[in-house]
Amino acid sequence: MRDMRVHRRNGHVWLCCLALFAAACTTAPPRGTLASPSAEILPTDARAMAYGATTAQVLRNSEMADKVRALFGPDWMPGTPRAGQMLVPGAEAYFEQGAMVRLLRIGGTDYIAVSGCVPGNCDSRHALLLIEVGGGRLFARLDEGGFVHYYGYGSEGVMRDTAQLIADSGYRALYPPGSRYQRART
Protein backbone atom coordinates (compact mmCIF):
# COMPACT_ATOMS: atom_id res chain seq x y z
CA MET A 1 0.00 0.00 0.00
CA ARG A 2 2.83 2.35 0.88
CA ASP A 3 4.54 1.69 -2.48
CA MET A 4 1.34 2.61 -4.26
CA ARG A 5 1.19 5.98 -2.44
CA VAL A 6 4.82 6.71 -3.34
CA HIS A 7 4.17 5.89 -7.00
CA ARG A 8 1.02 8.01 -7.00
CA ARG A 9 2.87 10.93 -5.36
CA ASN A 10 5.75 10.63 -7.85
CA GLY A 11 3.22 10.55 -10.66
CA HIS A 12 1.61 13.74 -9.37
CA VAL A 13 4.99 15.48 -9.04
CA TRP A 14 5.91 14.44 -12.58
CA LEU A 15 2.56 15.65 -13.90
CA CYS A 16 2.95 19.02 -12.13
CA CYS A 17 6.45 19.44 -13.59
CA LEU A 18 5.14 18.64 -17.05
CA ALA A 19 2.32 21.17 -16.65
CA LEU A 20 4.76 23.88 -15.51
CA PHE A 21 7.08 23.14 -18.42
CA ALA A 22 4.22 23.27 -20.92
CA ALA A 23 2.93 26.54 -19.46
CA ALA A 24 6.38 28.11 -19.66
CA CYS A 25 6.63 27.18 -23.34
CA THR A 26 3.33 28.82 -24.21
CA THR A 27 3.44 31.91 -22.01
CA ALA A 28 3.32 35.18 -23.91
CA PRO A 29 6.39 37.42 -23.65
CA PRO A 30 6.26 40.17 -21.04
CA ARG A 31 4.23 43.24 -21.95
CA GLY A 32 6.30 45.68 -24.00
CA THR A 33 8.56 42.96 -25.44
CA LEU A 34 8.59 42.85 -29.23
CA ALA A 35 8.44 39.45 -30.92
CA SER A 36 10.67 38.57 -33.86
CA PRO A 37 8.74 38.86 -37.12
CA SER A 38 8.44 35.84 -39.38
CA ALA A 39 10.68 35.78 -42.45
CA GLU A 40 10.70 33.89 -45.72
CA ILE A 41 12.82 33.84 -48.86
CA LEU A 42 10.92 35.00 -51.94
CA PRO A 43 11.69 34.28 -55.59
CA THR A 44 14.11 36.90 -56.89
CA ASP A 45 12.37 39.39 -59.18
CA ALA A 46 12.98 42.87 -60.61
CA ARG A 47 12.48 44.49 -57.18
CA ALA A 48 15.51 42.61 -55.84
CA MET A 49 17.65 43.97 -58.67
CA ALA A 50 16.58 47.60 -58.24
CA TYR A 51 20.06 48.63 -57.05
CA GLY A 52 22.14 45.89 -58.67
CA ALA A 53 22.44 42.12 -58.93
CA THR A 54 25.52 41.70 -56.72
CA THR A 55 26.74 43.05 -53.41
CA ALA A 56 29.35 45.24 -55.11
CA GLN A 57 26.79 46.74 -57.50
CA VAL A 58 24.37 47.59 -54.68
CA LEU A 59 27.09 49.23 -52.57
CA ARG A 60 28.21 51.37 -55.54
CA ASN A 61 24.68 52.27 -56.66
CA SER A 62 24.17 56.05 -56.70
CA GLU A 63 20.87 55.77 -54.76
CA MET A 64 22.28 53.45 -52.08
CA ALA A 65 25.95 54.36 -51.57
CA ASP A 66 25.34 57.36 -49.30
CA LYS A 67 22.57 55.59 -47.36
CA VAL A 68 24.80 52.57 -46.70
CA ARG A 69 27.63 54.81 -45.47
CA ALA A 70 25.17 56.71 -43.26
CA LEU A 71 23.84 53.39 -41.93
CA PHE A 72 27.27 52.33 -40.66
CA GLY A 73 28.53 55.82 -39.81
CA PRO A 74 32.15 55.80 -38.60
CA ASP A 75 32.17 51.98 -38.71
CA TRP A 76 32.14 51.96 -42.54
CA MET A 77 35.81 52.78 -43.10
CA PRO A 78 38.72 50.80 -41.63
CA GLY A 79 40.61 52.40 -38.80
CA THR A 80 41.82 52.02 -35.28
CA PRO A 81 39.43 51.75 -32.35
CA ARG A 82 38.39 55.25 -31.39
CA ALA A 83 35.39 56.99 -29.96
CA GLY A 84 32.32 56.13 -32.01
CA GLN A 85 33.88 53.28 -34.02
CA MET A 86 33.19 49.65 -33.10
CA LEU A 87 34.75 47.78 -36.04
CA VAL A 88 38.50 47.94 -36.63
CA PRO A 89 38.42 46.44 -40.15
CA GLY A 90 35.45 48.63 -41.04
CA ALA A 91 32.05 47.44 -42.26
CA GLU A 92 33.16 47.83 -45.88
CA ALA A 93 35.49 44.82 -45.44
CA TYR A 94 32.50 42.63 -44.50
CA PHE A 95 31.12 43.03 -48.03
CA GLU A 96 34.33 42.39 -50.01
CA GLN A 97 33.28 38.82 -50.79
CA GLY A 98 29.64 39.32 -51.72
CA ALA A 99 26.86 37.15 -53.05
CA MET A 100 23.90 37.50 -55.35
CA VAL A 101 21.09 39.70 -54.10
CA ARG A 102 18.02 37.94 -52.63
CA LEU A 103 14.49 38.99 -51.75
CA LEU A 104 12.99 38.38 -48.29
CA ARG A 105 9.63 39.07 -46.70
CA ILE A 106 9.98 39.92 -43.03
CA GLY A 107 6.87 40.67 -41.02
CA GLY A 108 4.89 41.39 -44.19
CA THR A 109 7.46 43.85 -45.61
CA ASP A 110 9.73 42.97 -48.54
CA TYR A 111 13.48 43.53 -48.27
CA ILE A 112 16.40 43.24 -50.64
CA ALA A 113 19.00 41.07 -48.89
CA VAL A 114 22.66 41.81 -49.58
CA SER A 115 25.21 39.56 -47.91
CA GLY A 116 28.96 39.36 -47.75
CA CYS A 117 31.95 38.38 -45.68
CA VAL A 118 35.58 39.19 -44.99
CA PRO A 119 37.64 37.13 -47.50
CA GLY A 120 39.42 34.24 -45.80
CA ASN A 121 37.29 34.65 -42.68
CA CYS A 122 33.74 34.04 -43.91
CA ASP A 123 32.78 31.60 -41.16
CA SER A 124 33.23 34.18 -38.40
CA ARG A 125 33.08 37.63 -40.06
CA HIS A 126 30.01 38.06 -42.25
CA ALA A 127 27.30 40.63 -42.83
CA LEU A 128 23.70 40.98 -43.92
CA LEU A 129 22.29 44.24 -45.26
CA LEU A 130 18.51 44.52 -45.65
CA ILE A 131 17.08 47.28 -47.83
CA GLU A 132 13.34 47.82 -47.62
CA VAL A 133 11.88 47.68 -51.13
CA GLY A 134 11.71 51.34 -52.11
CA GLY A 135 14.94 52.12 -50.22
CA GLY A 136 13.41 53.99 -47.28
CA ARG A 137 14.84 51.91 -44.44
CA LEU A 138 18.02 49.86 -44.13
CA PHE A 139 19.01 47.32 -41.49
CA ALA A 140 22.28 45.48 -41.05
CA ARG A 141 23.80 42.75 -38.95
CA LEU A 142 27.57 42.23 -38.82
CA ASP A 143 28.95 39.13 -37.11
CA GLU A 144 32.41 39.84 -35.77
CA GLY A 145 33.69 36.46 -34.63
CA GLY A 146 31.02 35.87 -31.99
CA PHE A 147 30.00 39.48 -31.34
CA VAL A 148 27.08 40.87 -33.36
CA HIS A 149 26.61 44.54 -34.33
CA TYR A 150 23.24 45.91 -35.45
CA TYR A 151 22.56 49.02 -37.51
CA GLY A 152 19.43 50.84 -38.68
CA TYR A 153 18.79 53.72 -41.05
CA GLY A 154 15.46 55.49 -41.46
CA SER A 155 12.93 56.51 -38.83
CA GLU A 156 14.86 56.73 -35.53
CA GLY A 157 12.13 55.35 -33.22
CA VAL A 158 11.45 52.38 -35.47
CA MET A 159 15.16 51.60 -35.83
CA ARG A 160 15.88 51.54 -32.11
CA ASP A 161 13.01 49.13 -31.44
CA THR A 162 13.20 46.86 -34.47
CA ALA A 163 16.66 46.84 -36.11
CA GLN A 164 17.85 43.75 -34.23
CA LEU A 165 14.55 41.87 -34.63
CA ILE A 166 14.35 42.47 -38.37
CA ALA A 167 18.03 41.76 -39.03
CA ASP A 168 17.95 38.55 -36.97
CA SER A 169 14.76 37.34 -38.69
CA GLY A 170 16.35 37.89 -42.10
CA TYR A 171 19.52 36.14 -40.97
CA ARG A 172 17.60 33.09 -39.71
CA ALA A 173 15.69 32.85 -43.00
CA LEU A 174 18.89 32.90 -45.07
CA TYR A 175 21.02 30.82 -42.68
CA PRO A 176 18.84 28.32 -40.80
CA PRO A 177 20.31 26.32 -37.90
CA GLY A 178 22.99 23.96 -39.17
CA SER A 179 24.01 26.18 -42.10
CA ARG A 180 27.62 27.25 -42.55
CA TYR A 181 27.30 30.58 -40.73
CA GLN A 182 25.19 29.10 -37.92
CA ARG A 183 27.76 26.35 -37.26
CA ALA A 184 30.52 28.95 -37.01
CA ARG A 185 28.63 30.80 -34.27
CA THR A 186 28.03 27.81 -32.01
Residue ranges and their predicted role:
Residues 26-28:
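Bacterial signal peptide processing site
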Residues 74-140:
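Mature extracytoplasmic domains of secretory-pathway proteins
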Residues 21-24:
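C-terminal motif of bacterial Sec signal peptides marking the signal peptidase cleavage site
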Residues 34, 45-54, 58-72, 76, ...:
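C-terminal partner/receptor-binding element of secreted or periplasmic proteins
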Residues 40-50, 90-93:
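Short acidic/polar alpha-helix capping motifs at helix-coil junctions
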Residues 2-15:
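Bacterial N-terminal signal peptides that target proteins for export
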Residues 31-43:
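N-terminal propeptides/low-complexity segments immediately following signal peptides
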